[in-house]
Amino acid sequence: DGLIQTDVTIVAVTVDETGVITDCVIDAVQAKANFDSQGQLLTDLTVPVPSKNELGADYGMGSISGIGKEWNEQAQALADYVVGKTADEVLGIAVDEATKPAEADLASSVTISIGGFQNAIAEAVDRAQPLGAQAGDELRLVTSNSMAAGNAPEGAAGMVETNVNIAAVTMNGDAFTSCVIDAVQAQVSFDGQG
């Protein structure tokens, strides 16, 4: 039997006119599908694929984390930590060989690997552009995720496709002040051998 796993890192930021982060939201999608040695899918792909923030305590990291924090709590702690920093300062956050925080104040609230998030945050800062958001607007990140696939018929490859639709919005009360929409479509081929 085999496993197909797709991991998608999602970051949104707002920055001021000097490139300093004023707000940050971090999320991730981890989509998994199992298949057997005949290349038949074993996973029900009609089941929704929640993001790690949507999973919250159901992700199950809190019970095994050395600090007792769930993934979404650690992602929020990292997001809070980078507010007030530039892209270069985010990239300069000290990490160990596993890219886990090496700075004591961050390591007390974050034990997950952050290297990929550092890069994603810095890229988000570099790509930020004025779209209507104002100081004090609330930044939100929303995803709609799904999987689709086809079995691997004898001698041929099957395919699993993960679709992650993303909207990063800023809001002033009930009014949208800016919106960026993007998507990730990851395709993985497989057969009875893997």
Where are these regions (language model features)?
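Active-site- and interface-proximal helix/loop "cap" or "latch" segments in soluble metabolic
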Residues: 1-194
